[in-house]
């Protein structure tokens, strides 16, 4: 299942990101003539598509054409949770400057059927941090963990 880049991007405001703090992001829209992503910057993007995965485990991978442009679309979060219902936030980085456009093909979702009963899916999980529906990229909620 192909997914596309939404027109929404975000970047962290501070130069140093603190895992124990709620780091603020600045949201912006990709203009019609595209936006140049730069190395050394983490960009948060989102998929144009809203997905629900009640009986499936979703895996997100970048399209090979995207990888060949030097674009990574997720840092570590390629596997989703059963019960995740939202747009996917993408953790985008590039190896060299690359101009991207809203609605360009960005990735592929692969679904694996869950066998057996799901006791508690993500949408009902007490510790779920990304249940607030939004078409905008969502910043890290690591600060909500106790450590």
Question: Could you tell me what each predicted segment is?
Answer:
Residues 1-147:
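DUTPase catalytic domain/fold
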